[in-house]
């Protein structure tokens, strides 16, 4: 099928290796140069955070998003005639709007990085097109909008539709001029619609949307901003955390249809995911003289400390390094040091989140809305409750055993080591008692009491 350049700019014919080469940031080994422990910890954190390793999920999402945008372009401006007609129309995109894409996931799984990667892939071509009467039109496949500077429409859109705006901001930074006058909302929306059509910009992606959730009126404000940008014409892709999506679910049905009917969820690593192994290997390569764990062997333990979330993995490793350097320590990080970091004050916030995530996964009940996916499960852990429970119980038992072991004297520890194999061989398997669901009767309670007496 022959496509116009407006739709072809979203063709995604790259192999996995080509995607990795274009958007990946390989690990760079740190050179310490005699820095003290505090500086080393900062260098380590920066080095770990800079690693971008595309995985199977990331590549699939990039291809899926590009395909959705290409379909949008094909349905709106594939023929030159329809495109030229739109150039002279006040409403080039028409009145119908496709549902926005709600891109969500746990904080720290890599959503912002994926949007930046998508922007890099689409903008790398730098193509132009020509149609009858119009030559050398720049194709701008995507607007990447951020709320870091504010949530006003001038702050969000002006730099994309008014080239003079960025020049004015640069001059303000140099104290050479005053701030340019803001456009009215109708004016900026009208210009945004026409500029996006002219440059065949079929995707408007909003990142850093968590900035808008700080106010008490976040629900109404977020919906208003999203609906205004959604009404421009390009396909809207907005990155939102779970808490905001829960708030948007309370909006009227027409708002939910526009903003929540097309969700895409980015999930954390699973406990035995090969991509987690590859990611851990990349992190080890940043400081192989520091990290002494084996990624393939120890990744399940690391999953138990982090729930497979990239940001938490990095923060755990940095916290473990800081702790092991205290008092002139050796600065080596293995699983025991990560376990110490997990229990420390440096990782307390993450530890609370991880424990809530595991409990929610097993119980199926909401404890914290900002950690509960509004659209379904977020994990790559199998949904089998027995397996998930076993993972959590193994983790809790391991932590308890370590605490008990640390409290023993050297003599007691040697005695425990001598008894441990024999104890393991003689241990009897636990007995699981299954209780019938339903309302308990007096007879049930009496029977249960008799059973407990026999067991005791």
Language-model features, listed with the residues they occupy:
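C-terminal alpha-helical "lid" subdomain
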Residues: 2-33, 198, 270-277, 281-456
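The catalytic "switch" region of P-loop NTPases
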Residues: 193-202, 211-215, 219-297
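A short hydrophobic beta-strand->loop->alpha-helix junction that borders the nucleotide-binding pocket
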Residues: 104, 142-151
């Amino acid at each position: 099928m022959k496509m116009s350049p407006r739709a072809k700019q979203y063709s995604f014919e790259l192999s996995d290796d080509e995607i990795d080469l274009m958007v990946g940031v390989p690990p760079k080994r740190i050179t310490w140069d005699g820095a003290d422990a505090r500086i080393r910890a900062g260098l380590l954190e920066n080095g770990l955070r800079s690693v971008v390793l595309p995985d199977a999920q990331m590549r699939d999402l990039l291809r899926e998003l590009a395909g959705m945008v290409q379909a949008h372009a094909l349905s709106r401006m594939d023929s030159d005639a329809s495109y030229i007609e739109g150039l002279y129309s006040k409403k080039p995109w028409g009145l119908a709007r496709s549902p926005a894409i709600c891109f969500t996931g746990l904080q720290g799984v890599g959503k912002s990085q994926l949007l930046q990667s998508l922007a890099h892939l689409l903008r790398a071509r730098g193509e132009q097109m020509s149609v009858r009467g119009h030559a050398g039109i720049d194709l701008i496949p995507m607007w990447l909008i951020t709320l870091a500077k504010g949530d006003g429409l001038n702050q969000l859109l002006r730099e994309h539709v008014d080239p003079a705006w960025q020049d004015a901001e640069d001059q303000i930074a140099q104290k050479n001029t005053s701030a340019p006058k803001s456009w009215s909302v109708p004016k900026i929306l009208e210009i945004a619609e026409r500029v996006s059509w002219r440059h065949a910009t079929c995707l408007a992606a909003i990142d850093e949307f968590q900035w808008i959730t700080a106010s008490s009126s976040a629900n109404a404000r977020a919906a208003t901003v999203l609906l205004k940008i959604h009404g421009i014409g390009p396909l809207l892709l907005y990155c939102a955390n779970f808490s905001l999506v829960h708030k948007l679910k309370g909006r009227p049905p027409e708002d939910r249809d526009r903003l929540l009917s097309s969700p895409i969820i980015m999930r954390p690593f699973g406990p035995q995911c090969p991509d987690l192994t590859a990611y851990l290997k990349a992190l080890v390569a940043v400081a192989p003289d520091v990290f002494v764990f084996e990624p393939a062997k120890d990744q399940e333990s690391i999953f138990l400390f982090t729930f497979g979330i990239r940001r938490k993995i990095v923060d755990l490793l940095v916290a473990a390094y800081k702790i092991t350097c205290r008092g002139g320590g050796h600065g080596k990080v293995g699983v025991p040091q990560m376990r110490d970091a997990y229990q420390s004050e440096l990782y307390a916030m993450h530890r609370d989140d991880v424990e809530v995530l595991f409990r929610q996964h097993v119980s199926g009940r909401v404890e914290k809305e900002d950690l509960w996916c509004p659209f379904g499960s977020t994990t790559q852990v199998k949904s089998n409750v027995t397996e998930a429970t076993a993972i959590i119980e193994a983790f809790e038992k391991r932590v308890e055993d370590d605490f008990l072991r640390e409290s023993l004297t050297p003599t007691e520890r040697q005695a425990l080591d001598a008894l441990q194999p024999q104890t393991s061989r003689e241990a009897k398997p636990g007995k699981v008692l299954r209780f019938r669901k339903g309302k308990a009767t007096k007879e049930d309670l009496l029977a249960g009491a008799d059973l407990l007496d026999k067991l005791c």
